[in-house]
UniProtKB/Swiss-Prot annotation:
Quaternary structure annotation from Swiss-Prot or TrEMBL: Heteromultimer composed of HisG and HisZ subunits.
Biological process according to GO: L-histidine biosynthetic process
Job description of the protein: Catalyzes the condensation of ATP and 5-phosphoribose 1-diphosphate to form N'-(5'-phosphoribosyl)-ATP (PR-ATP). Has a crucial role in the pathway because the rate of histidine biosynthesis seems to be controlled primarily by regulation of HisG enzymatic activity.
Subcellular location: Cytoplasm
Entry keyword annotation includes Protease: no
Organism: Leptothrix cholodnii (strain ATCC 51168 / LMG 8142 / SP-6) (Leptothrix discophora (strain SP-6))
Entry keywords, A to Z: Amino-acid biosynthesis, ATP-binding, Cytoplasm, Glycosyltransferase, Histidine biosynthesis, Nucleotide-binding, Transferase
Catalytic activity, EC: 2.4.2.17
Record-linked NCBIfam families: hisG
Catalytic EC class: transferase
Protein name, as recorded: ATP phosphoribosyltransferase
Catalysed reactions, as listed in the record: 1-(5-phospho-beta-D-ribosyl)-ATP + diphosphate = 5-phospho-alpha-D-ribose 1-diphosphate + ATP
Lineage start: Bacteria, Pseudomonadati, Pseudomonadota, Betaproteobacteria, Burkholderiales
Gene3D superfamilies: Periplasmic binding protein-like II (3.40.190.10)
Amino acid sequence: MITLALSKGRIFEETLPLLAAAGIEVTEDPEKSRKLILPTNRADMQVVMVRATDVPTYVQYGGADLGVAGKDILIEHGGEGLYQPIDLRIARCRMSVATRADFDYDSAVKKGSRIRVATKYTAIARQHFADKGVHVDLIKLYGSMELAPLTGLADAIVDLVSTGSTLKANHLREVEPFMEISSRLVVNQAALKLKRERLRPLIDAIAAAVAARG
């Protein structure tokens, strides 16, 4: 059995056409089903629905043979034990710094200065500000990032931005986009060796589908 780990939402929806190009169809809708293990049109393949942040862990430890995860999630996870053969170029967005509209960000990030930042992506934020020579006090949050600058909890946030409409609605401005994000196919390295005859054609078919989309 080949097990593919996916998360609900945008990544799931944008992965489906790539799977279809490889001859695979998920035969139940995760939005309508309470099942966490979904069948496909192939008797030897199933899909497990997990939280986006858990996809790399499932693949790393063999709970799934392969999965689809955002670059942001993979950096935060560390990527240990994972083969990342394909940038699927789906679920695209960017990692950015945002602040209140009246906050002087340029002065706050002069070399040697210190800034307080709220984020879910602590590894990414820490590296970004280290590269700028700025001391950063990180506050780990799991949601509603936009509140942090508005309540004085933090000077800035580091978060994923797609259209920027949520920032604008909360009177924040995007001051520094610094990383393009898309989703990757990740494969368990041991599974690639043990199930190579079944996994390699699947990986190649998905790669061909990505290339065909340009």
